[in-house]
């Protein structure tokens, strides 16, 4: 009954991944991002991650696999997803939703830390403000974006962009794969410490 639709969806996902893989700069950006994160951890820094909706879940997934585990047991790495409900509701109410991530970065971000901002459109105002706050703190910035990078294009030290202009779920599928590869590479870098 739905075999054609299922095949179509899987083929579109495979095509999106194939297009991402064609650009060697994406592979280089993933490697540079992993090394940047591992270097921050080795120097006593941490990563703060943020996103909205499904990207918020990806930010949480990234942090939990760093503090918990990915495939193998190892020491936890300092990662915080900006996801505390009381913080989010307080700042949304008192300052506006555009400030939910930047206020947290202002409070706990330090020079040597890294911000990972995830936005499929690249146009999330609250992540743009978080990037500005991270810059003011002397933090490095990595972004996972999609389409043409939106307003976030060019704002990060390292941008990993999925150049897909269809539905956001295709971009998110590549983002989660990139997140898993980042963690795998971070683990390899950390054993070099």
Curated annotation (Swiss-Prot):
PROSITE patterns xrefs: SIS (PS51464)
InterPro entries found in the cross-reference section: GmhA/DiaA, Phosphoheptose_Isoase, SIS_dom, SIS_dom_sf, SIS_GmhA/DiaA_subfam
Subcellular location: Cytoplasm
UniProt binding sites for substrate: 52-54, 65, 93-94, 119-121, 124, 172
SUPFAM superfamilies (UniProt xref): SIS domain
GO MF entries: carbohydrate derivative binding; D-sedoheptulose 7-phosphate isomerase activity; zinc ion binding
Keywords assigned by UniProt, alphabetized: Carbohydrate metabolism, Cytoplasm, Isomerase, Metal-binding, Zinc
Biological processes annotated in GO: carbohydrate metabolic process; D-glycero-D-manno-heptose 7-phosphate biosynthetic process
Enzyme class: isomerase
Cofactor annotation remark: Binds 1 zinc ion per subunit.
Main location per the UniProt record: cytoplasm
Required cofactor names: Zn(2+)
Pfam families: SIS_2
Record function comment: Catalyzes the isomerization of sedoheptulose 7-phosphate in D-glycero-D-manno-heptose 7-phosphate.
Further comment: The reaction produces a racemic mixture of D-glycero-alpha-D-manno-heptose 7-phosphate and D-glycero-beta-D-manno-heptose 7-phosphate.
Subunit structure: Homotetramer.
Protein name per the record: Phosphoheptose isomerase
Organism: Yersinia pestis (strain Pestoides F)
